[in-house]
Amino acid sequence: QEIMKKLFLTTILLAFVAISISAKKHYTVVLSLDGYRWDYTQWYNTPFMDMMAEKGVESGLIPSYPSKTFPNHYTLVTGLYPDHHGIVANNFYDVRTGASFSLGNAEQKTNPVYYGGDPIWNTAKRQELKTAVFYWPGSDVCVCGSYPDTYYIYDKQPRLTMQQRLDGIIEQLALPEKKRPDLIMGYLEEPDHNGHDFGPQGKQTRAMVQKVDSMLTNFYKRMQALPIANDINLIILSDHGMAWVAKGNNVPIRHLLKDEWLVKIEGNIPANIYVKPGCQDSVYNALHGIEHARVWKRNNIPARLHYGTNGRVGDVIVDPDLGWLIQNKEANEGGAHGFDPEYSDVHALFRAVGPDFKHIKFPHFANVNVYSLICHLLGIKESKNDGNIDNIRTILQ
């Protein structure tokens, strides 16, 4: 009986130890590198990304359609397809408000009316967690009356440099425990800019990919020197990749369309065409069969793209072949994205390392699953979304 009693007490004690270990606080850091192709790490010298692959999860993300910056960054933090969260393109027209959402217009860009869903910083904040966000698209918008605990306005000058943002993340992690955020997110606009200007295989793009890699090497060293280093889950990802566009690879459509049919045309990968009442068939028939593109009515977009149920999507969509732009102006050579996620050129980076991640090479997965993953890491209840942690549970310890 004495032995049984001791065994029972030992079991209870072990259970307590196990609970206290599993309840040990883990922090989550998510960094987005705009326009970082999943295979840049194969083309260029990226020792930091290689180290992450050797220690943790090596994968890639399949972007949501269209493979553009704002729709995908907002998908990453809500788990919703652009069609469901409302940021259906970088630039779009809203029939209900009669206004255009544009990245170049700070007032429209920060208008909460456009942002649906429950961004991760709101999900976390409601469940008593602290958040700090450095320039993630949508983080300076008052979605559902709330901001992250710490955030920065992207259009306010002087803008924090990429290095200052990385420094800021380290500063947040070094705060006393009571003030330290549970979730820290950061956004870097490179290598996207260079990818556009010089193409994915341009010398300057390679130089920027390698510059970002060395910045991250330094960032990681500083992170590893913190007392909480072993309690940090670090995710490095991107919103989309980058495809090569050759000079002259443009599909002009304007000359085929009558003014009296049109309200507005927004974007060039894809082009969203907003038409006057009763003119959808005229526009569709005028464009159907053009070279280097597919033309769809809004309600006939292939189901796999999860696009077209939102009223902000054009009445007619012109979706170009990889490497082509829908525009009258001659295309310059360089890089572009927005294309169908079936093309691996627009697939994005995913790396993760930390106490909750296995060392594993995992197939590319849909980026709607990232919100669910972050909720899981933070131990919080997720809001309704289009992803599912079960799709990627294999990457977790």
Task: Go through the PLM ranges and name each one.
Residues 30, 48, 211-252:
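Metal-dependent active-site segment of extracytoplasmic phospho-/sulfohydrolases and closely related
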Residues 24-29, 54-58, 126-132, 178-184, ...:
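Loop/turn elements at helix/coil->beta-strand transitions in domains of secreted/extracellular proteins
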Residues 1-26:
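Bacterial Sec-dependent N-terminal signal peptides
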